[in-house]
Amino acid sequence: MAEDHDRLTSLEAGQRIPFGGDRVAVVSAQLASEFRPGDHLVVVQDSGRLLRIPAEQHELVDAAVGQAVSGFGALAECTDDQITAFFDRFAGFLRDEDTFAPIAAANIDDVERARARGRSTTRLVLDEKMRRGMIAGLEGWRDTTADRDRVVDAIAHDGWSVAAHRAPLGVVGFVFEGRPNVFADACGVVRTGNSVVFRIGSDALGTATAIVEHALLPALAAAGLPSGTVKLVESAEHSAGHALFSDRRLALAVARGSGAAVAELGAVARQSGVAVSLHGTGGCLLYTSPSP
């Protein structure tokens, strides 16, 4: 029998919120005053921290993930050659001086705003070295052998057989720190037939938006891939990252940045049933396999 549940429309200072089975978190006066009808409340089960997701941030992320879900379905009907063409055109648009000019201008604005706020701009400046690195990264994915939907192992017996197929995951969510060159990282999952939604740190949001407008979307269109294949969450709010990682439609959540923030994002994803890959303190993974 289905149960009726009321919507949470307000909070009261001192209100006790159960979590972790036998613990409670207490609503602060600030959280109670800020919470509005339509907002979402996430209780981090690892720590009891109460996270408010404003209604507009939830709606923004919900729409982006919905488009990525549709994009993932449509991507299955596209060819590997189309995906190859996407990476090629994306790299080409970044190489073209006329196309890159508004991206460079947006980056200058981002850098000036960051400096005015006393923020580090070490990884924010989209200089020629970073530009070449982005192009090389995209061309690397372009030249990677297509590896979607193929049989990787099979066993045959009299009257029956079983086979293991490699298949795409689905929608992959990324939360990155504020640096413009994350596009090659995020878009890499498209090579294997996945769609992606990502949020970037506020310092680089203007640059990221310009890259989407002048290079990413034109590359998707030129290759005939669905526009929902790659979606940028155009929000500077940290709550957008929490909304993204609490969306159960994600197949995988990937976070990069400072250790504490990444750990919290991972906790939000895990308690929502989403697999996570976290990179908060640096490190390296090496995968090896037998020679073919």
Language model features with spans:
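N-terminal Rossmann-like NAD(P)+-binding subdomain of aldehyde/semialdehyde dehydrogenases
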Residues: 1-160
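Conserved small-residue-rich beta-alpha loop and adjacent elements
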Residues: 136, 140-218, 223, 251, ...
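Glycine/threonine-rich helix-loop capping motifs at alpha-helix boundaries
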Residues: 1, 102-115, 262-281
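A glycine-rich helix N-cap at a beta->alpha junction
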Residues: 224-231
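General beta-strand structural signal in soluble alpha/beta enzymes
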Residues: 198, 231-234, 254-257, 276-280
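A structured beta-alpha segment of the ubiquitous adenosine-cofactor-binding alpha/beta core
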Residues: 161, 231-248
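Conserved small/polar residues in nucleotide/adenosyl-binding loops
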Residues: 287-292
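Hydrophobic/aromatic ligand-binding patch that stacks against planar heteroaromatic rings
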Residues: 188-189, 244, 268
